[in-house]
Every structure is written in structure tokens, then in C-alpha cells.
């Protein structure tokens, strides 16, 4: 989870030490995806910069295809931007859930598929 306040500047450098391309889509970032959110090939790195203009809770995730599988494998999280003058709370809970829908065996998984057992496991 990334956290900040309205007006904070974020600078995140990602180095891809894996074997396939990856990227990050910061929903809170309001940036042009063609310039800063392109896929990072193995061995490359890219620095993402954005300023938080609005308070709220947004998702960030790998946006390189197969995106749904990257998210289902944990390549996602939350960006929490607090508003000015936020009052203290007694407790705070930060949850994030993901799903992956599988097709027939060896056909992959994506958003166009449906659960094999929609009424339970």
C-alpha cells in the first residue's frame, strides 16, 4: 500500500528483474499511460512520477497483458490519498481482493471467461 496526502509527489522506480515485461498503472496518478506507464522489459527500469490531486483510495496494478493473471498473482495494491485536515480514527482496515476466472483446461484466464462452478466451490 502506498499512502500520501493531497499535494504529495510520488516517485517510484521499478527495476524489472523478472523474465517478462511488466508495468504499473497508478489509478490515482492521472498520468498519460503512453509515456510513463509503458511495459518495462526484463533488465530495464522506469521511474513513475505523479502528484496526488484528489483524495481517495485507488488501485495500482501491473497493466501488461495478461493483466488479469498478473493481478491475480498479487501484482496489485492500494494507493490511499488522505484529504486535508483528516480527523483521526480509532481503527483503519485496508483490504484488497482479486478474482481470476478460469476457462476450460489450458485456455488461460481473463475477464471474458466465467467461473467453471458459478454456484460454489
Predicted segments, located by residue:
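Acidic-aromatic/histidine active-site loop/patch
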Residues: 96-121
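Short loop/turn segments at secondary-structure transitions that flank enzyme active sites
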Residues: 30, 68, 85, 101-104
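Beta-sandwich strand segments
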Residues: 70-73, 87, 108
Amino acid at each position: 500500500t502506498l499512502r500520501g496526502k493531497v499535494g504529495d509527489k510520488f516517485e517510484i522506480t521499478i527495476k524489472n528483474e523478472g523474465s517478462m515485461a511488466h508495468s504499473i498503472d497508478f489509478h490515482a496518478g492521472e498520468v498519460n499511460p503512453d509515456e510513463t506507464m509503458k511495459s518495462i522489459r526484463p533488465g530495464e527500469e522506469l521511474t513513475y512520477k505523479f502528484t496526488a490531486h484528489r483524495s481517495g483510495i485507488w488501485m495500482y496494478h501491473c497493466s501488461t497483458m495478461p493483466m488479469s493473471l498478473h493481478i491475480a498473482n498479487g501484482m496489485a495494491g492500494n494507493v490511499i490519498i488522505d484529504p486535508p485536515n483528516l480527523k483521526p480514527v480509532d481503527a483503519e482496515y485496508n483490504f484488497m481482493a482479486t478474482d481470476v476466472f478460469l476457462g476450460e483446461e489450458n485456455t488461460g484466464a481473463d475477464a471474458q471467461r466465467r467461473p467453471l462452478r458459478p454456484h460454489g466451490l
